[in-house]
Amino acid sequence: MIDISRELQVAINTGKVVIGFEETKKALLTGAPKLIILAANAPKWARDDIEYYAKLAGVPIFVFPGSSIELGAAAKRPHKIMALAVIDAGQSEILKLAEQHA
């Protein structure tokens, strides 16, 4: 089992991760990230929007099993995070989340 918080930290430190709903949406429209992570309590409108663009781009979505506050804490940020996009996983194995939950 992958430790989501640890792998997210490794991805942030060694790869490229964009944080926030708008930034994630921009990444989907322009750069095709490798994985999208959504907080379990993301509002329906936001989830629908991200899921639509992710489906068009063929990008897998992982629903983080916690709130936006917990996702922010997992990313070592002092704020809520509703969505984030992994552009480059770096040395992490975070992309295996998409395989496990496909």
From Swiss-Prot:
The keyword Ribonucleoprotein applies. It comes from the Archaea. GO terms for cellular component: cytosolic large ribosomal subunit. It holds the Pfam family Ribosomal_L7Ae. Keywords: Ribonucleoprotein, Ribosomal protein. GO terms for biological process: translation. Gene3D superfamilies: 3.30.1330.30. One of its GO terms (molecular function) is structural constituent of ribosome. InterPro entries: Ribosomal_eL30 (IPR000231), Ribosomal_eL30-like (IPR039109), Ribosomal_eL30-like_sf (IPR029064), Ribosomal_eL30_CS (IPR022991), Ribosomal_eL8/eL30/eS12/Gad45 (IPR004038). Belongs to the eukaryotic ribosomal protein eL30 family. This is Large ribosomal subunit protein eL30. It comes from Pyrobaculum aerophilum (strain ATCC 51768 / DSM 7523 / JCM 9630 / CIP 104966 / NBRC 100827 / IM2). The gene is rpl30e.
